[in-house]
UniProtKB/Swiss-Prot annotation:
The modification Phosphoserine is found at residue 62. It is a peripheral membrane protein. Monomer. Part of the heterodimeric LMA1 complex together with the proteinase inhibitor PBI2. LMA1 binds to the ATPase SEC18. PANTHER family: THIOREDOXIN-LIKE PROTEIN 1. Present with 17237 molecules/cell in log phase SD medium. Belongs to the thioredoxin family. This is Thioredoxin-2. There is a cross-link at residues 67, 97 (Glycyl lysine isopeptide (Lys-Gly) (interchain with G-Cter in ubiquitin)). Participates as a hydrogen donor in redox reactions through the reversible oxidation of its active center dithiol to a disulfide, accompanied by the transfer of 2 electrons and 2 protons. It is involved in many cellular processes, including deoxyribonucleotide synthesis, repair of oxidatively damaged proteins, protein folding, sulfur metabolism, and redox homeostasis. Thioredoxin-dependent enzymes include phosphoadenosine-phosphosulfate reductase MET16, alkyl-hydroperoxide reductase DOT5, thioredoxin peroxidases TSA1 and TSA2, alkyl hydroperoxide reductase AHP1, and peroxiredoxin HYR1.
Length: 104
């Protein structure tokens, strides 16, 4: 399951998941590629239960998107121990799966 983060404090709490891989999908409701990739991210969340999956609307929580230096959507940022380990920009399922598999 992919949980939506609705505030900076929810985002900070999500990143404090210890050594667990945290995947945050930065999206926008008006973004076509974001809508296209969303079902794949849900599928990855089911496949990789050792990771925590979140999504964040860049228009609702713009301060977090700015802080994370997100300028294109979708951008998926992968965190471990609260620190970014990699990111995938664009609706690229193969790159997203590779990033998850190599960091779980």
């Amino acid at each position: 399951m992919v949980t939506q983060l609705k505030s900076a404090s929810e985002y900070d709490s999500a990143l404090a998941s210890g050594d667990k891989l945290v995947v945050v999908d930065f999206f926008a409701t008006w973004c076509g590629p974001c809508k296209m990739i969303a079902p794949m991210i849900e599928k990855f969340a089911e496949q990789y239960s050792d990771a925590a999956f979140y999504k964040l609307d860049v228009d609702e929580v713009s301060d977090v998107a700015q802080k994370a230096e997100v300028s294109s959507m979708p951008t998926l940022i992968f965190y471990k121990g609260g620190k970014e380990v990699t990111r995938v920009v664009g609706a690229n399922p193969a790159a997203i799966k590779q990033a998850i598999a190599s960091n779980v």
